[in-house]
């Protein structure tokens, strides 16, 4: 199981993308013949006084101040003029599903795009629930944009298949290119990265985050410009290959604007010391291995604490791969200013952890392995009163492992960190009382993801289902937009979600529910639902049909190892032609040929994709 520890923030999916499918006839025109006579006269009079191009110029200047996707979406729906001007003034586009529209539709609608955020595979791909060759290819997007957007400056991809050729075309096509962010992507190697480093002379951001990067034995670090660079952020902690440290040291020295640097595990603590002395301006640091060289180059060990002390601007700290505990005190000098700390790769004990966290009074974001135990979480609760986001990952993700964190840690956090807004908590045991306490103590929660790793586990004290705990979360946390549920849950828990989860946009369900009625409660009761992820739950055809009135308004529905039939999926595909219904991995040669192993449904403006592999059947 792959944990998504890519960024110290939640996905920015709470705002809708602008409508790309609206023809001009679908938008109300205040000058149309359907308007009332008075409105028509007023509109004609106004157009005579102020020509259309004057009004559009004024509107163009106004819309430039709208940054929110949601606001721009609303503006584009006012009338044809607003729709047209909004498209002309939009420089940033977010596409939450690369198959929701074609690249051609994007370039036809928006002519001046400088920044693109594009997402591919659904999130359950992170848990090995999707075959690796499913799709989400970047190739058609970069080839289309190469012709349409010569001024493109930023590409941010997540769960996309990106090849070295794609990166080469990107580097050749956009002379002013500045930012490349690849999160959980695959298909490319150090050869492609070297081309970007060499040809994108204005590059400010190169962030490779949780991506699978092939080692082509290319010295990509040496491919950056030999003179002063524009680099502001360089993250390559996911690159599982040695790097040319001398070239890296020179690159850091030539990058006076560098604020973020995240190193891979092949950079030792001694080398980190040298980098810090040459880059005191850093604000975000990923430390690399945090262990010394196997063969020290000198008898006297460097003063690591002094190097950290020189970096007075560091507020975000991560890394700590291959951690050697005796060196951990070196970070003491920066702890007081930290707002973000990521120990999610460090197997650190409570005794090692507590001296660190007790100095982090400004911390707002904290990620860690469950090796810090309940004792460590109690120290967090006692110290970090400004905490907004907490993520606790399992050191041992097996279902039958002994989890070192429990309801005790969760209860402590809820009592000590009253400003908490987002939590992801992996554990082996939990109680309703602890979850209810969190709902009462942390009413500002927008994200609550509780992952009880053992299947169908009840409240381990009372033996009852976890219904009341999750019910309290949706009832008391009025701002909740994202919810992940687990443990022993009956239909009652889902009834609570449908009754109180009016703002929930993303719901993840694993091993939960009694019957189809559970899913029906959610589909009929959660009007804002956009993303629905379900695995190993007893929901079947009746449940799926109950949401047909909702699917056009949702980004996607994912259901795996449930009780769906291919016949039901075909019926939905026939009834909803603008909904793409993919059946993944079903075997037609056995007795269960009508059984659907995995269903992935999503809305699309351009119909089914043309690159589906053989194991995908589009109904």
Swiss-Prot record:
<dbReference type="GO" id="GO:0019005">
    <property type="term" value="C:SCF ubiquitin ligase complex"/>
</dbReference>
<feature type="site" description="Interaction with auxin-responsive proteins">
    <location>
        <position position="426"/>
    </location>
</feature>
<comment type="subunit">
    <text>Part of a SCF (SKP1-cullin-F-box) protein ligase complex. May interact with auxin and auxin-responsive proteins.</text>
</comment>
<dbReference type="GO" id="GO:0009734">
    <property type="term" value="P:auxin-activated signaling pathway"/>
</dbReference>
<feature type="region of interest" description="Interaction with auxin-responsive proteins">
    <location>
        <begin position="510"/>
        <end position="511"/>
    </location>
</feature>
<dbReference type="GO" id="GO:0010011">
    <property type="term" value="F:auxin binding"/>
</dbReference>
<dbReference type="InterPro" id="IPR036047">
    <property type="entry name" value="F-box-like_dom_sf"/>
</dbReference>
<comment type="pathway">
    <text>Protein modification; protein ubiquitination.</text>
</comment>
<feature type="region of interest" description="Interaction with auxin-responsive proteins">
    <location>
        <begin position="394"/>
        <end position="399"/>
    </location>
</feature>
<feature type="domain" description="F-box">
    <location>
        <begin position="54"/>
        <end position="97"/>
    </location>
</feature>
<dbReference type="InterPro" id="IPR041567">
    <property type="entry name" value="COI1_F-box"/>
</dbReference>
<feature type="compositionally biased region" description="Low complexity">
    <location>
        <begin position="16"/>
        <end position="43"/>
    </location>
</feature>
<dbReference type="InterPro" id="IPR032675">
    <property type="entry name" value="LRR_dom_sf"/>
</dbReference>
<dbReference type="GO" id="GO:0005634">
    <property type="term" value="C:nucleus"/>
</dbReference>
<dbReference type="GO" id="GO:0000822">
    <property type="term" value="F:inositol hexakisphosphate binding"/>
</dbReference>
<feature type="region of interest" description="Disordered">
    <location>
        <begin position="1"/>
        <end position="43"/>
    </location>
</feature>
<keyword id="KW-0539">Nucleus</keyword>
<feature type="region of interest" description="Interaction with auxin-responsive proteins">
    <location>
        <begin position="451"/>
        <end position="455"/>
    </location>
</feature>
<feature type="site" description="Interaction with auxin-responsive proteins">
    <location>
        <position position="210"/>
    </location>
</feature>
<feature type="binding site">
    <location>
        <begin position="530"/>
        <end position="531"/>
    </location>
    <ligand>
        <name>1D-myo-inositol hexakisphosphate</name>
    </ligand>
</feature>
<dbReference type="GO" id="GO:0016567">
    <property type="term" value="P:protein ubiquitination"/>
</dbReference>
<feature type="binding site">
    <location>
        <begin position="447"/>
        <end position="449"/>
    </location>
    <ligand>
        <name>1D-myo-inositol hexakisphosphate</name>
    </ligand>
</feature>
<feature type="binding site">
    <location>
        <position position="391"/>
    </location>
    <ligand>
        <name>1D-myo-inositol hexakisphosphate</name>
    </ligand>
</feature>
<feature type="binding site">
    <location>
        <begin position="158"/>
        <end position="159"/>
    </location>
    <ligand>
        <name>1D-myo-inositol hexakisphosphate</name>
    </ligand>
</feature>
<dbReference type="Pfam" id="PF18511">
    <property type="entry name" value="F-box_5"/>
</dbReference>
<feature type="region of interest" description="Interaction with auxin-responsive proteins">
    <location>
        <begin position="126"/>
        <end position="127"/>
    </location>
</feature>
<dbReference type="Pfam" id="PF18791">
    <property type="entry name" value="Transp_inhibit"/>
</dbReference>
<feature type="binding site">
    <location>
        <position position="482"/>
    </location>
    <ligand>
        <name>1D-myo-inositol hexakisphosphate</name>
    </ligand>
</feature>
<feature type="binding site">
    <location>
        <position position="555"/>
    </location>
    <ligand>
        <name>1D-myo-inositol hexakisphosphate</name>
    </ligand>
</feature>
<dbReference type="InterPro" id="IPR006553">
    <property type="entry name" value="Leu-rich_rpt_Cys-con_subtyp"/>
</dbReference>
<keyword id="KW-0927">Auxin signaling pathway</keyword>
<keyword id="KW-0833">Ubl conjugation pathway</keyword>
<feature type="site" description="Interaction with auxin-responsive proteins">
    <location>
        <position position="535"/>
    </location>
</feature>
<feature type="binding site">
    <location>
        <position position="119"/>
    </location>
    <ligand>
        <name>1D-myo-inositol hexakisphosphate</name>
    </ligand>
</feature>
<protein>
    <recommendedName>
        <fullName>Transport inhibitor response 1-like protein</fullName>
    </recommendedName>
</protein>
<dbReference type="InterPro" id="IPR041101">
    <property type="entry name" value="Transp_inhibit"/>
</dbReference>
